[in-house]
């Protein structure tokens, strides 16, 4: 039996020591950790000695909203089979999903406002009237 632990806006926690341990040791006990960072530099700044270990122990790398060449180049280097130009020119409704030991794929981003599986599963948002 496994447990999924979602850490949205993970960088807001600051340097969170248990993240390293949970991504490496505790996965053997059935804990899956999904930390969400805004960009790679947040991970590198908070974990300068361990960011690569954390990244290497992630089962999936999901990327969307590539803002500039620096972000595109760094992400392309990590993914390996997608180039920076492709990332920079990616449509706003697309994402790259890189699963460990598999070729990265482009996929459509889900949109809860219009996708049928989400209908009736959320309250109206006055920001999207």
Label every PLM stretch briefly.
Residues 97:
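Conserved active-site motif detector
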Residues 92-94:
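Glycine-centered loop/turn motifs
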Residues 1-89, 101-105, 110-123:
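Conserved P-loop NTPase motor cores
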């Amino acid at each position: 039996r496994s447990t999924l632990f979602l850490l949205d806006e993970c960088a807001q926690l600051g340097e969170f020591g248990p993240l390293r341990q949970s991504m490496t040791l505790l996965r053997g006990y059935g804990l899956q950790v999904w930390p969400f960072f805004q960009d790679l530099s947040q991970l590198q700044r908070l974990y300068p000695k361990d960011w690569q270990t954390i990244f290497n122990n992630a089962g999936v790398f999901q990327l969307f909203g590539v803002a500039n060449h620096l972000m595109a180049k760094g992400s392309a280097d990590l993914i390996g089979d997608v180039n920076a130009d492709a990332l920079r020119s990616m449509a706003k409704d697309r994402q790259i999903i890189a699963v460990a030991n598999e070729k990265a794929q482009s996929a459509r981003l889900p949109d809860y406002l219009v996708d049928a599986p989400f209908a009736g599963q959320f309250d109206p948002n006055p920001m999207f009237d």
